[in-house]
């Protein structure tokens, strides 16, 4: 977009697209330039994990956990850890079930079998609620920023910002 509705001075527009890199428009999509100067859209760059240098789309993991009978929703992000990235999977469960060792092993086994060992989350954590945008999309970026000790951008776009408090208090993910 060239501007936001109701953003007469352009501050919201600038914050959304120009704060990550100085004087460079950053929209959050990962693209690949072809040898014929075309571009291939690969998806959201903030929805890409990179453990051990292997690029993984979060949707690959979501596809594996969405139809596990005790999981209602999932959110997956990468956390910078030991000069690499570790995958953290957050889930909500039916009837508030706990994620015990047996359930954790089932989730990891399914991901390993249908994807690869690099896709397997290092940690699986049950959460009370998944944060979402006002349009209903899962908010991966804010959770990733929290667990990596970064400042949250665009908190005003989150429909349920109180859900972020749980992630802020997770002691097992403190770096």
Feature roles, as predicted:
Residues 3, 12-15, 19-119, 138, ...:
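AMP-binding/adenylate-forming catalytic core of the ANL superfamily
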Residues 7-9:
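Short Gly/aromatic-enriched secondary-structure transition segments
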Residues 76, 125-126:
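Hydrophobic/anchoring residues in structured secondary elements
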Residues 127-152:
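Flexible lysine-rich "adenylation lid" loop at the C-terminal edge of ANL adenylation domains
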